[in-house]
């Protein structure tokens, strides 16, 4: 199976080349763990290769996303790519008549997309009138987006587990969690792969996840 590079060379190596092509990956974690930056880094990796990429934000505005990226050396080219191979779509939560189905319809207005990031899945629950309805429409959305041939990352704030508590981890092909851990009384970020269909990986082994002035990278340290 062909692979899609993640934007983190060491993570690509651990996963045998990257995420399996045309899969849905849930990236969960608490506030400040790096979910948004992980998603944008994934898109910039593809956009630089000429792949069509779209970041769908239910939180920050496009201006806020760009400002966050420009704080890191390896992500400063974000503005040059917008309007060419990268789009940032902001969907306001107060928008009337919004539903997950209409949400997907908005995405179909773009030319064929190779990579999509949706941030934040927790907010999508507001588009449904029940938990059951959300699960059904969420599953339908994933099937549709995979069917058109795109690789999808969904960012989500975890609810004490590895997803938001509405079964998203079950529906997605892969699950990565970002978190803060204490190592010798020093707080550090970590990345853990909990699930990844069609690929071998170190199951549930936390790896050091570094965010510095240069950008994002996976460290050599395994946190055991």
Walk through the language-model features, giving the residues of each:
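Phosphate-binding/switch region of NTP-binding enzymes
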Residues: 154-214, 224
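Pre-Walker A adenine-sensing motif
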Residues: 6-18
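Structural beta-sheet core signal
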Residues: 55, 152-154
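Phosphate-binding/switch loop-helix module in NTP-utilizing enzymes
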Residues: 89-150
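Conserved P-loop
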Residues: 25, 30-95
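NTP-binding/hydrolysis catalytic cores, primarily Walker-type P-loop NTPases
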Residues: 1-8, 109-111, 208-224
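Short glycine-/polar-rich loops that comprise or flank the Walker A/P-loop
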Residues: 49-52, 84, 149-150, 171-174, ...
């Amino acid at each position: 199976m062909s692979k899609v590079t993640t934007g983190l060379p060491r993570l690509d190596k651990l996963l045998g080349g990257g995420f399996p092509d045309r899969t849905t990956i849930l990236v969960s974690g608490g506030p400040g763990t790096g979910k948004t930056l992980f998603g944008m880094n994934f898109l910039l990796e593809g956009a630089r290769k000429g792949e069509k990429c779209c970041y769908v934000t239910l939180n920050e505005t496009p201006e806020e996303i760009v400002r966050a990226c420009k704080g890191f050396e390896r992500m400063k080219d974000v503005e040059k790519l917008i309007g060419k191979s990268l789009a940032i779509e902001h969907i306001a939560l107060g928008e009337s008549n919004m539903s997950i189905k209409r949400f997907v319809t908005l995405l179909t207005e773009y030319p064929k997309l190779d990579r999509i990031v949706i941030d934040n899945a927790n907010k999508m629950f507001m588009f449904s009138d029940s938990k059951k309805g959300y699960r059904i429409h969420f599953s339908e959305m994933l099937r549709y987006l995979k069917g058109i041939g795109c690789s999808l990352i969904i960012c989500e704030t975890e609810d004490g587990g590895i997803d938001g508590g509405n079964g998203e981890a079950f529906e997605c092909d892969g699950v990565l969690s970002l978190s803060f851990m204490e190592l010798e009384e020093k707080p550090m970020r970590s990345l853990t792969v909990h699930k990844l269909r069609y690929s071998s990986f170190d199951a549930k082994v936390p790896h050091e996840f570094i965010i510095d002035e240069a950008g994002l990278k996976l460290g050599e340290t395994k946190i055991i």
